[in-house]
Amino acid sequence: MKLIIFTGLVLFAIVSLIEAEEESGRGCILLYGECTKATDSCCSNLICDCYRKLEKGVQIARQCFCSEKDVIYKKDI
């Protein structure tokens, strides 16, 4: 009986440690991933670029994406 309780406690501790590690060290957001709600979560070699979506001159949304540092994107018409 003691062995079963001990085994259960050990398994619970292992699962708790794994969950805590996932929360504290969540993976960074990769290239072109959306970072609107977490602007500081892009991987170390990326930055979070934000864009305003306008409709008839009025902002209706804001979207952010992880992109490469020192890279400028231009609209190709």
From Swiss-Prot:
Tissues showing expression: Expressed by the venom gland.
Post-translational modification: Contains 4 disulfide bonds.
Signal peptide stretch: 1-20
Subcellular location: Secreted
Pfam families: Toxin_35
Keyword Disulfide bond in annotation: yes
Protein's UniProt keywords contain Aminoacyl-tRNA synthetase: no
InterPro entries in UniProt: Spider_toxin_CSTX_knottin
Keywords: Disulfide bond, Secreted, Signal, Toxin
GO cellular component entries: extracellular region
Molecular-function GO terms, alphabetical: toxin activity
Residues excised as propeptide: 21-26
Protein family membership: Belongs to the neurotoxin 19 (CSTX) family. 10 (U11-Lctx) subfamily.
Protein name (record): U11-lycotoxin-Ls1d
